[in-house]
UniProtKB/Swiss-Prot annotation:
It comes from the Bacteria. Transmembrane segments: none annotated. Keywords: Cytoplasm, RNA-binding. GO terms for cellular component: cytosol. GO terms for molecular function: RNA binding. This is SsrA-binding protein. Required for rescue of stalled ribosomes mediated by trans-translation. Binds to transfer-messenger RNA (tmRNA), required for stable association of tmRNA with ribosomes. tmRNA and SmpB together mimic tRNA shape, replacing the anticodon stem-loop with SmpB. tmRNA is encoded by the ssrA gene; the 2 termini fold to resemble tRNA(Ala) and it encodes a 'tag peptide', a short internal open reading frame. During trans-translation Ala-aminoacylated tmRNA acts like a tRNA, entering the A-site of stalled ribosomes, displacing the stalled mRNA.
Length: 160
């Protein structure tokens, strides 16, 4: 008998699908996160959400705001677990200066795109984003529907 292949676990913890729908993503950067122990355990259990999260700058540092990490039910009682606390992003000074300059342009913001594991470290992919207008969103939907229709036509043509 052959051995069954072990399933490879996905490294992705959470995705922000709404960001790609609501914004044009100009640039993407990988950043580390400063986390507490209970947050790491909760993220390993898949209890993280970055749906409405974005990046703010305070005192020359970047922080992830709006991300939610729900504590496990078996978490210690002597530690106060705040699921929505702001978490510091670990970036070098050159990246911070570049992001700060780009974010201060008119109409640009920085949003969290995905949260994932890279080895033993939790990373967040952040993107420099510009808001989409309603007609841009409709155009994206039309393009997506046309791609599906085109693929269906090609598949049926090959069957023939």
């Amino acid at each position: 008998m052959t051995k069954k292949k072990a399933k490879v676990a996905s490294n992705t913890i959470a995705l922000n699908k709404r960001a790609r729908h609501d914004y044009f993503i100009e640039d993407e950067i990988e950043a580390g996160l400063s986390l507490q122990g209970w947050e790491v355990k909760s993220m390993r259990a898949g209890k993280a959400s970055i749906g409405d999260s974005y990046i703010i700058f305070k005192h020359g540092e970047a922080y992830l705001f709006g991300a939610t990490i729900q504590p496990l039910s078996v978490a210690s009682t002597h530690i106060v677990c705040d699921p929505t606390r702001t978490r510091k992003l670990l970036l070098n000074q050159k990246e911070l200066a570049s992001l700060f300059g780009k974010a201060n342009r008119d109409g640009f913001t920085i949003v969290a795109l995905s949260l994932y594991w890279k080895g033993p470290w939790a990373k967040v992919k952040i993107g420099l984003a510009k808001g989409k207008k309603l007609h841009d969103k409709r155009e994206d939907i039309k393009d997506r529907e046309w791609k599906v229709t085109k693929d269906r036509i090609m598949k049926n043509a090959q069957r023939g």
